[in-house]
């Protein structure tokens, strides 16, 4: 899982609500550590996810972004 956690409090809530193992989320560091450039967060999150899926030989991944105004978007990708 690659979650844009620029607002890290919401990420904690998502992990809890979806019962995700924190060890499987943002394994190379998230947006707070790596950055979340305006207009490029989605690209950064998706490319990081795709590279990690190849590295771990995973077939399915999930990328999500928080957006301004309390909105969000998510994408499931398969390879």
What label would you give each PLM region?
Residues 1-79:
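Claisen-condensing/thiolase-fold acyl-transfer catalytic domains that form or cleave C-C bonds
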